[in-house]
């Protein structure tokens, strides 16, 4: 795979020098490197024991919404890492936008037909996939760029590290369509809030900030702002030149792969519980009285507050675990 251009002076094709900071996936995709190609996603061998899962939606290639094809290819790649065949994975591609969320048409169709078990299964499959990414045997490095919305955020947040393009528009925007994040987004935002923030901030202050970010469907207009809003972690890498994204992510994956240990399962999450939820509910009532939100907005806000404050089990002296948050998130969704 070499690039060449026609040189008008030499009057013949001239091979371009390979930039060591750039992996061109279009050139890299030869028969030997593509391990499996599905309708909307593919698994590639990037060399050095690193896999690449890339999206190329057959329905909306410009936006790359999540569908079952994405989940299948991510699961295949994770299984290859689990078996020891490969040691790390890069989640990224070189399309127009990284991922503009989940395919809501599928969810709408299931709900309109009253197929609640199937809907629950679809959401749980996405949640389980995000947990598999988080606890993978080898590091998963995500490389987001341009639009990263809803489910797109939920796919990258559980990765071991993120290498984001400086120009990245990122946000959990589900509240804008009358839903709350359902693919693990609430759990990731809670974990990011607990790990981030200042030492002077208590659990309620951290969750209040997260509630405002998700509840108002705030979209970061840069990778740096995404860190400030809690979508990205403070130690995530930001790359100015998007062409360098995949190579930088691969280098980071190889760096992390040496002696990699998956994160510990969190069963010690201390969330505000009913007391914190009451305070958030009062704030919602204030917004409603001022005409800033509708009746339905208030209902969605209360569902979101229920999940972020830890449901019925959380409290000042009681801890909850990751799976409990995922379960109440799925129920509220």
Write out the residue ranges for each language-model feature.
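Intrinsically disordered, low-complexity segments enriched in small/flexible residues
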Residues: 1-90, 191-218, 228, 234, ...
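A structural preference for short, pocket-lining loop segments at secondary-structure junctions
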Residues: 50-53, 69-117, 124-145, 165-169
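Short, histidine-centered active-site or binding-site loop motifs used for metal coordination
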Residues: 55-59, 111, 174
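Glycine-/small-residue-rich active-site loops that bind phosphorylated ligands and cofactors
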Residues: 58, 62, 96, 148, ...
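Residues that form or flank phosphate/diphosphate-binding pockets in enzymes
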Residues: 65, 99, 151
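Single, functionally critical "micro-switch" positions that shape active/binding sites
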Residues: 66, 102, 159
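Conserved catalytic cores of soluble enzyme domains
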Residues: 119-123, 127, 131-266
């Amino acid at each position: 795979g070499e690039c060449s251009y026609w040189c008008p002076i030499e009057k013949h094709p001239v091979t371009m020098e390979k930039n060591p900071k750039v992996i061109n996936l279009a050139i890299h995709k030869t028969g030997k490197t593509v391990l499996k190609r599905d309708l909307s996603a593919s698994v590639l061998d990037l060399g050095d024991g690193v896999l690449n899962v890339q999206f190329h939606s057959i329905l909306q290639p410009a936006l790359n919404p999540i569908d079952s094809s994405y989940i299948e290819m991510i699961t295949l790649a994770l299984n290859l890492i689990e078996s020891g065949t490969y040691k790390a994975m890069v989640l990224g591609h070189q399309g127009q936008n990284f991922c503009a969320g989940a395919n809501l048409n599928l969810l709408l169709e299931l709900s309109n037909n009253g197929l609640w078990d199937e809907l629950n299964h679809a959401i749980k499959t996405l949640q389980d996939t995000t947990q598999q990414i988080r606890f993978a045997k080898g590091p998963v490095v995500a490389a987001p760029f341009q639009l990263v919305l809803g489910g797109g955020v939920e796919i990258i947040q559980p990765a071991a590290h993120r290498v984001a393009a400086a120009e990245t528009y990122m946000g959990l925007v589900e509240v804008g369509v009358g839903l709350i994040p359902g693919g693990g987004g609430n759990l990731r935002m809670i974990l990011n809030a607990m790990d981030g923030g200042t030492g002077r901030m208590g659990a309620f202050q951290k969750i209040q900030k997260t509630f405002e970010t998700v509840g108002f469907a705030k979209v970061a207009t840069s990778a740096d702002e995404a860190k400030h809003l809690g979508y990205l972690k403070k130690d995530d890498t930001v790359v100015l030149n998007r062409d360098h994204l995949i190579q930088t992510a691969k280098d980071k994956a190889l760096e992390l792969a040496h002696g990699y240990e998956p994160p510990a399962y969190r069963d010690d999450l201390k969330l505000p519980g009913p007391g914190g939820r009451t305070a958030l509910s009062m704030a919602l009532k204030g917004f409603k009285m001022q005409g800033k939100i509708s009746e339905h907005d208030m209902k969605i806000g209360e569902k979101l507050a229920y999940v972020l404050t830890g449901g019925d089990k959380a409290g000042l002296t009681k801890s909850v675990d990751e799976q409990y948050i995922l379960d109440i998130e799925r129920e509220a969704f």
